[in-house]
Amino acid sequence: MVKKNSFISVITQEEKEENSGSVEFQVFHFTSKIRRLTSHLELHKRDFLSQKGLRIILGKRQRLLTYLSKKNKVRYKKLTDQLNIREPKIS
């Protein structure tokens, strides 16, 4: 059985049902998957397929965040603050 994450939900249940395609919901969903995979990989360090899946999900989330930052900086900042997502390093 899958445990629910203990961090605060940014999106209410009604919003999840209505806006499952919104960028905020997708980032929230990817973040919960990332946290679940990270805790799994702490126990199973040699699970290379899960590591690859984690990298893929991280890339998808980063592309969505880049899109959101270009379209609406206020929503981007609010979402990253609520989900405790770090700003990407600019090289």
Swiss-Prot record:
One Pfam short name: Ribosomal_S15
GO molecular function: structural constituent of ribosome
Gene Ontology process terms (BP): translation
A cellular component term, taken from the record's GO annotations: ribonucleoprotein complex
Domain of life: Eukaryota
SMART domains linked to this entry: Ribosomal_S15 (SM01387)
Keywords noted in UniProt: Chloroplast, Plastid, Ribonucleoprotein, Ribosomal protein
Family, as annotated: Belongs to the universal ribosomal protein uS15 family.
Subunit relationships: Part of the 30S ribosomal subunit.
Protein name per its UniProtKB record: Small ribosomal subunit protein uS15c
Organism field: Phalaenopsis aphrodite subsp. formosana
